[in-house]
């Protein structure tokens, strides 16, 4: 690895670390205090919530995952807070995997594709019922928006780096509005997962988002 390559890799890592992540529902201390059983219950609830959550009471959820009501109330004071906890942990796990999918030596444009493909796993199993429940619940909608904003910010940081290195845009044309592009390409997964869109497309939200990311970025690549 040359010095120039090392500096480029360091710059990519630095920019990613400079983007502030959304505040977690469970803080780090509380997360580390979770027992193995509590983690198992939260993971099981994630599967239950794939098919929606507004119809469930805490008693219903305890019955579905085979635990006591006390176990659930030890995790969260209410059904709504429990839903937020489960969704937030899922999105954070996917977000970490998306960052880990990046090689510091990747060119920025390749990094954008890899990052968004991994991040779009968040909508891979979205069902119409879950999409409707999330859209109709202000707290979960705000949580999803916070994670989407982070996705946009990371994508913009990578786009800025791609522009600086001459990977995007026509050298003789107008400058690329990286903020606008980031909102579009990073928001595709969430858009295709909306209730009004999820039943209208022939593929999954993740597949549709990945395909359109490739189309858009190819159109913006700098010509040889």
Question: Model-derived features: where do they sit?
Answer:
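N-terminal intrinsically disordered/low-complexity leader segments
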Residues: 1-39, 224
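Hydrophobic/aromatic-rich alpha-helical bundle segments in the mid-to-C-terminal region
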Residues: 3-5, 130-134, 141, 145, ...
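A short, Lys/Arg-enriched amphipathic alpha-helix from helix-turn-helix/homeodomain DNA-binding modules
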Residues: 35-46, 99
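Helix-turn-helix
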Residues: 40, 44, 51-81, 85
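Short amphipathic alpha-helical elements of helix-turn-helix/winged-helix folds
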Residues: 44-48, 118, 122, 188
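Short helix-capping/turn signature of helix-turn-helix
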Residues: 51, 76, 132-140
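Hydrophobic alpha-helical connector segments
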Residues: 85, 98-125, 181-182
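Short, basic, alpha-helical segments at the C-terminal edge of helix-turn-helix-like DNA-binding modules
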Residues: 87-95
């Amino acid at each position: 690895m040359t010095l120039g390559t090392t500096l480029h890799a360091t710059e990519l890592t630095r920019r990613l670390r400079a983007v502030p992540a959304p505040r977690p529902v469970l803080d780090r201390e509380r997360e580390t205090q979770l027992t193995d059983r509590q983690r198992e219950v939260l993971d099981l609830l994630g599967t239950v919530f794939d098919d929606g959550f507004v119809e469930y009471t805490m008693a219903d959820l305890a019955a579905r995952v085979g635990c006591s009501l006390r176990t659930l109330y030890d995790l969260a004071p209410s059904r709504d807070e429990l839903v937020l906890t489960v969704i937030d942990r899922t999105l954070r796990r996917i977000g970490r995997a998306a960052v880990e999918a990046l090689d510091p030596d990747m060119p920025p444009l390749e990094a954008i594709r890899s990052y968004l493909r991994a991040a779009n796993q968040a909508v891979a199993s979205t069902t119409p019922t879950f999409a409707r429940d999330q859209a109709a619940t202000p707290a979960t909608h705000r949580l999803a928006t916070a994670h989407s904003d982070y996705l946009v910010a990371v994508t913009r940081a990578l786009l800025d780096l791609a522009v600086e290195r001459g990977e995007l845009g026509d050298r003789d044309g107008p400058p690329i509005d990286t903020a606008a592009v980031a909102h579009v390409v990073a928001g595709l997964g969430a858009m295709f997962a909306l209730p009004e869109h999820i039943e209208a497309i022939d593929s999954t939200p993740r597949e549709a988002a990945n395909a359109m990311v490739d189309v858009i970025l190819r159109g913006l690549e700098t010509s040889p």
